[in-house]
UniProtKB/Swiss-Prot annotation:
It comes from Methanosarcina acetivorans (strain ATCC 35395 / DSM 2834 / JCM 12185 / C2A). The gene is thyA. Monomer. The lineage of its organism: Archaea, Methanobacteriati, Methanobacteriota, Stenosarchaea group, Methanomicrobia. It is an enzyme of class 2 (transferase). This is Putative thymidylate synthase. Its main location: cytoplasm. It is found in: Cytoplasm. One of its GO terms (cellular component) is cytosol. HAMAP family: Thymidy_synth_arch. Its EC number is 2.1.1.-. PANTHER family: THYMIDYLATE SYNTHASE 1. Gene3D superfamilies: Thymidylate synthase/dCMP hydroxymethylase domain.
Length: 217
């Protein structure tokens, strides 16, 4: 582990599992320990970009606590917008019913059907009048869909990204969402790129991450 402050790395990963392990390795070995605004200690690496070339194979890392049943439920909520457990918000809710006004996924699909080279097929989760006044706010901020080279690709921006606990679920859900959008538009699903402004692991996951990284190296 290094104390030298560093910003910005790019990973080109084969699949979700490869992305997770390599991301954890960078955070653990090149991140800095800080105390966040809630008083939690995290090891953080800023501006980590991960390009996942095939997010449809090896979607569930061996060392994650997530199992297929929980991941499928997560993906279902992301695509449908359901909030069966009455959370303060869900990503699906923000994408499907933004500010109780806009189904952004339908907008994305229609935009890509109308104009396959569109640069406007973008969905956001942040609602300024709401999220500037509450404690629980979205970590995933933006999903951008583009059709290039005959496939629809997804780029997702996270302002804050719990790499140890949430990354496998986030990417499983996003890969299912991209398959859904691609199916509706009538093209093949492509690559997923994540941009994590604060890619971090919480102190309660440090033992797990240290053991994983030792196994990698």
């Amino acid at each position: 582990m290094e104390d030298k402050f560093e910003i910005g790395r790019i990973i080109r990963a084969k699949n979700i599992s490869d992305a997770w392990y390599r991301g954890l390795n960078i955070i653990w070995n090149h991140g800095q320990v800080i105390t966040d605004e809630r008083g939690s200690q995290i090891r953080e690496f800023m501006d980590l970009m991960v390009v996942i070339e095939n997010p449809y194979t090896d979607r569930i890392p061996e060392d994650t606590a997530w199992n297929e049943e929980r991941l499928e439920e997560y993906a279902k909520q992301l695509i449908s917008g359901e909030n069966a457990q009455d959370f303060e918000y869900t990503y699906g809710q923000r994408l499907r019913n933004w500010n109780e006004e806009v189904d952004q996924i339908e907008y994305v699909i229609e935009k890509l059907q109308e104009s396959p080279t569109s640069r406007r097929a973008t969905a956001v989760t942040w609602i300024p009048p709401v999220d500037t006044k509450v404690n629980e706010v979205p970590c995933m901020i933006l999903d951008d869909f583009k059709i290039r080279d005959g496939k629809v690709h997804l780029t997702t921006l996270f302002r804050s990204h719990d790499f140890g606990g949430a990354y496998p679920a986030n990417l499983y859900g996003l890969s299912k969402l991209l398959e859904y959008v691609a199916g509706r538009v009538g093209v093949e699903p492509g690559m997923i790129t994540t941009v994590s402004i604060s890619a971090h692991v919480y102190d309660h996951d440090w033992d797990m991450v240290e053991n994983i990284v030792k196994g990698i190296n």
